UniProtKB/Swiss-Prot annotation:
Family statement drawn from the similarity comment of this UniProt entry: Belongs to the CinA family.
Disulfide bonds: none
HAMAP family documented for this protein: CinA_B
Taxonomy of the source species: Bacteria, Bacillati, Bacillota, Bacilli, Bacillales
Highest rank taxon of the organism: Bacteria
Name listed for the protein in its UniProt record: Putative competence-damage inducible protein
PANTHER family: NICOTINAMIDE-NUCLEOTIDE AMIDOHYDROLASE PNCC, NMN AMIDOHYDROLASE-LIKE PROTEIN YFAY
SUPFAM superfamilies the record matches: CinA-like (SSF142433), Molybdenum cofactor biosynthesis proteins (SSF53218)
Length: 412
């Protein structure tokens, strides 16, 4: 079954709020085998909403509306759909009692426009609103399914989970949707796609969807099957084919983000970490401390932005700073080794470079050096040539730090 999500609200068109409902619904619908091919946003306008309904009816089996169920004059979703379908609106007694009780308890006047929230399409399945007043509803008519949901996410999401999804399962084939996200770093989206292009071109079940984000690339593998175990087998087969080709860049699944994976490995190895940050200015250390219980492996860090701190706190030789410069392989090496010694850690990692927008020390923005000093191992320095805004260069540098730390920890 194919669905279209129609979000109603002028505030969405003006960019005053984000349409998070569509993201939530798309993910939930996919998990029960309902395809979402279109998202539509329309303002609080009867004529344009009617046009959106007519277009959606031509290309979708299910129309899911969010918003426009409230008490004000511009809340017109129910009225427009009722007119389109030739259905009347009737009061739902449970919703009316709930709204009436609320106004009695709060001592407020129960006006006619507030009663409007209890109106539902005649013959519809009514979905209780446990976190608000306006109920949702579902109606199967003329070979189409119409779902009306409140706009506020705090009302819509629990309503969907408790009442709407069980209702929608009556219209699905019973196939289970199983997805797995493979996470890669150190390879661009175009490079990765070239290596697995034949698999993408030949995809049927499972499907392969690449996505690039902040220097990472993910591949979402999605399989459909009535048996979840069989769906997992379909995905595992394709995953094995992918990792045969680009496994060296793979680091985790789903929500296993790079910095969490690196910290997990530190804990597993029983090693401690210290950082010296010039370019990144604390970004790396901040991400380290997002992990619970990280005090067992993270000694701390030094933000050595000024050369005085590099020289007098982390003992980078003056001749290195004056000859090679603060943005250099030698400086990164000294910073990593000396912060390790200063904070008595097993591993020291350092970041120095040019974030931009201007050049520094005759080096272009994006020139970055990441140093990694591990006890009983030779110190290594990774030169990077990054692009992007000042903030993007800093964030990507920190991410490369986690990547090289993770890969090095895998080796030892």
């Amino acid at each position: 079954m194919n669905a279209e999500i129609i979000a109603v609200g002028t505030e969405l068109l003006l960019g005053q709020i984000a349409n998070t409902n569509a993201q939530f619904l798309s993910e939930k619908l996919a998990s029960i085998g309902i395809n979402v091919y279109y998202h539509t946003v329309v303002g609080d306008n009867n004529k344009r909403l009617q046009q959106a309904i007519e277009v959606a009816e031509e290309r979708a089996d299910m129309l899911i509306f969010t918003g426009g169920l409230g008490p004000t004059k511009d809340d017109l979703t129910k009225e427009t759909i009722a007119s389109s379908l030739g259905e009347e609106l009737v009061y739902d007694e449970n919703a009316l009692a709930l709204i009436s009780d609320y106004f009695k308890r709060t001592g407020r006047e129960f006006t006619e426009n507030n009663k409007k929230q209890a109106l539902v399409l005649n013959g519809a399945n009514v979905f209780a609103n446990d976190h608000g007043m306006a109920p949702g509803m579902g109606l199967n008519k003329n070979g189409k399914v119409y779902i009306l949901l409140p706009g506020p996410p705090k009302e819509m999401k629990p309503m969907y989970v408790s009442y709407v999804e069980p209702f929608l399962r009556n219209f699905t084939t019973g196939e289970n949707i199983y997805s797995r996200v493979l996470r890669f770093f150190g390879i661009g989206e175009s490079q990765l796609e070239v290596k697995v292009q034949d698999l993408i071109d030949g995809q049927t079940n499972p499907t392969i969807a690449p996505l690039a984000n902040d220097g990472e690339v993910t591949l979402r593998l999605t399989a459909k099957h009535q048996n979840v175990d069989e769906a997992e087998k379909l995905i595992q087969h394709v995953e094995d084919l992918i990792l045969e080709r680009v496994g060296e860049f793979f680091y985790g699944y789903d929500q296993e983000f790079l910095h969490y994976k690196a910290i997990e490995l530190l804990k597993k190895k029983g090693l401690t970490l210290a950082c010296a940050e010039s370019l990144t200015g604390g970004l790396f250390g901040n991400q380290v401390t997002e992990s619970a219980g990280v005090s067992s492996v993270f000694k701390g860090g030094v933000i050595c932005y000024h050369n005085d701190v590099k020289q007098h706190v982390l003992h980078v030789p003056e001749e290195v700073l004056s000859t090679d410069g603060a943005v250099s392989k030698e400086c990164a090496r000294y910073l990593a080794e000396n912060v390790k010694e200063l904070l008595k850690a097993d591993i020291g990692i350092s970041f120095t470079g040019v974030a931009g927008p201007d050049a520094s020390e005759h080096k272009e923005p994006g020139t970055v050096f990441v140093g990694l000093a591990i006890k009983d191992e030779p110190t290594v320095v990774f030169p990077l040539n990054l692009s992007g805004s000042r903030q993007q260069i800093r964030e990507r540098s920190a991410k490369y730090g986690f990547y090289h730390l993770y890969k090095k920890l895998e080796e030892i």
